[in-house]
Every structure is written in C-alpha cells, then in structure tokens.
Amino acid sequence: MLKDLCFEIIQTCPNHCLFCSSVAGMDKHQIIDYDLFKRTIDYFMSIGGIEEISISGGEPFLHPRLFEMIRYCKINGIKTVLFTSGIKMRNKMTDDDKQQLEFNLRQQYSSYLNEGMPKEEYENLITKLMNDYLKYDARTFDSLSTYDCHLLKNLGLDKIIFDFQAWNKDTYNQIMGSKDSFDFVTLSMIKVKSAGLVADAHFISTKVNYKELPDIVEMLNVANFDQLSILNFVPQGRGKDNESILSLSEEEFQEFIQIYDKCKEQFHGNLRIGIPLQGIDTHKCTAGFDKLVIKYDGTVLPCPAFKEYDIKKLNALGIKTPNIHYNLEDIKVHHGTRKQPLCKQLYKFNKSIQ
C-alpha cells in the first residue's frame, strides 16, 4: 500500500511566494486533468491502495474540478488532506445578477422615496450602492465561501492545511508575493473551523517572518486550530533564488528556538516540528518507498523536499522518476525505511529545534 501520496494538481497560484518550491504563480498554467487524476488513483488502488493523499498546488482551489477530485478520493476510502493558501477565484456577477441586484436595492430602499427623499438623491444613493458592490465584484480573488467549507465537510475531507506565514500584513505580502490577500486567508481560516473541519497551519521560519510566530500562535488559538507545523526552509524552486534573504543565520536560528519554546507553551493545539528540524531521527524516512510526490507536470518524486532537485542525482541514488503521463504503470510501491531522512542526506540539514 502507498502510505503517503502528495499530488500537485495545478501550478497556477494567486501568490508568488519567495520560497515556493513549485515556482507557482498566475502565469503558470500546468494542470492535472480530472481523468488523469482518476486514472492515477485507480492505478494505485489496483496495486495495494492509498492510505493518505495530500492534494496541493499551486493553489488547488483554482482547479475547476477540485471538489470532484476530493469526492473521488473519499469514495475510494482514502484519507484526504488539502493544502491551500485559502484563496480562490471570485465568482463574477453576470448581467442578470447585476440587474437583480439593482432591483433588490430599489426594493430595499423604496421607503426613502415614500418618506420624501428627492428623486435625484435617491438615484445617487442607488448608484453609489451599486458601485460599491461592483467594486467588490471586480476583485480577482476571494475567500472560501461558507458553502465551500460546508461542502468540503460533507464530502468527508479529513483535514485542510493553510499556508500561513505572517500576521503582519506587510510581512505577509512580502513573503507571499501578493497584495490584499491577507484578509481573504484569515476569513477562510475562520470559516473552515466554523464548518467543523479539522484545520492545521504550516509555518516556514525565514529571516523575513521568524519573529511573527507568537502572533500567529495567538491568531490560531482564537480560530481554534488543531495543529501548527514548523517547517524548515528548503532552498529549492523560487526559494533557491531567494536563499540569501530567507535562510536564517545561526544567531537568528538560536533566537527562533527561544521564540518557539515560548510558543510551545502558549499554543492550545499540537505544535509539530517537521522532519528536517528534528534533532533525532524519530521518524523513519520512507521517501521513494511507500511515500511519493506527483508534480503538476506528472513527474513522480520520493518526497516534497525534492521537487526541484537534480533528477540525475536522484536516479544515481536508485530513485526512479517516472511520469504519470507516459509510464504510470512503471511506478512501484516498496516497503522499508532509510537509515537517515533522505532530505537530510541531500540538503545536509544539521539544525534542529528539538
């Protein structure tokens, strides 16, 4: 059985994160179509099954058939986790919607005319209200709707994980490479918890944001989040280009450990440390055995830490890199563990929090 499958279904993303391993953005258009997704799931189910799948991107909420993908995973009895930045494309109003909106506004404020408001002033009021609605409608992105969140709950989604890197809006905009999206994200986080979903957050400590952790913990406590994962910055993809402005110095890392120790006592949920930051290899690495990643272009890799790693080096380590577009049936699931996490071997990680 495949224990852990991470499936990047799209490279398109509303953000332009400084550390993004997938080099995702709105100018990227590679996508896994629904039929290929189903065929891949069917293949793994035929050779032993899938215990857990993590659906990610890019931003998976920009995939037109995301909800169908989640439904298909749950039909097959797979524990399904969704990774997101909490942003989706805004559903624009049609001309009919706008006409209905204006009609409703006129009905709602008709008493103003009856109470003596001048006709011209009334028309100016309706115009202003319409313009306010249309200004909001002109936005490209939006938060998840209450309907979205309840649909995810009804589909049986097991967990949703938010990429949440800062509480200060300027810091958030800098590290996420976006503008005016912070409020969408926080609103989405509140909505998913209100819908009863299990919700976690991921935080990558960098020069830009490592001092933000206490404020993030406070917000997650208010939102009643279940878990916060502290992840190591991996210099791959866009992160490799920005390594000098992201990678913590030894002094900064030691300061972050002190911040982490305080936050560990304050967070109401579970505070988890990613494998590369664990001092002792308590987690037995299964990368390339019964743990796999499928990129947005169909390439199959052993672990998310290697999405931009040199393919020849991986092959030299005995790790095959097939592609679901061309040779899906060549993918084999093995069992076993590595003596040391593969990410620590290849990236020479030697810092630890625990």
Language-model-derived ranges and their functions:
Residues 1, 23, 299-300, 304-354:
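Flexible mid-to-C-terminal extensions adjoining Fe-S/redox cofactors in radical SAM and related proteins
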Residues 4, 288-289:
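Short coil/loop residues immediately preceding or within conserved phosphate-binding loops
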Residues 6, 10-13, 278, 296, ...:
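Residue-level signal for mature regions of secreted extracellular proteins and peptides
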Residues 1-151:
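Conserved alpha-helical substructure of the radical SAM core
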Residues 5, 9, 160-162, 201, ...:
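A structural signal for short, well-ordered beta-strand segments
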